[in-house]
Curated annotation (Swiss-Prot):
GO terms for molecular function: RNA binding. Transmembrane segments: none annotated. InterPro entries: NusB-like_sf (IPR035926), NusB_fam (IPR011605), NusB_RsmB_TIM44 (IPR006027). The gene is nusB. This is Transcription antitermination protein NusB. CDD domains: Terminator_NusB.
Amino acid sequence: MPDRRGDRGRHQARKRAVDLLFEAEARGLTAEAVADSRAALAEDQDDVAPLNPYTVLVARGVTEHAAHIDDLISAHLQGWTLERLPAVDRAILRVAVWELLHAEDVPEPVAVDEAVELAKELSTDESPGFVNGVLGQVMLVTPQIRAASQAVRGTGPAEG
């Protein structure tokens, strides 16, 4: 089922994924490792709610594709390096770029809009515009990246 603008469950799942990525970076772990530890904690303690499955999917996806995601973000930063960005902005961009590349049920404008909303909630006054600008540039190349990925896997329209 495609993601829709009013889907607050997905919004909260994205926000939690940003939290996990932020925590993982601060602790020197992968987002997947942090998600796994939270899942174990939820199993052991009744007062700890389990993570939304979409949060776990995003954490695993960002971990699996971290190098490619970071390269893509870095290629579209103008006057910045990934390391100089606020950690929360890095986490937001990583979630959004993963969605742009790998979440086929999430329309690109929704992924960008959700990232901008998260930047408004969690970061500086300048961050929403910055995040929107970077993701707007990334969106220009995502169709080619998705097509190349499908061709490598031997699926989709690139097959011929």
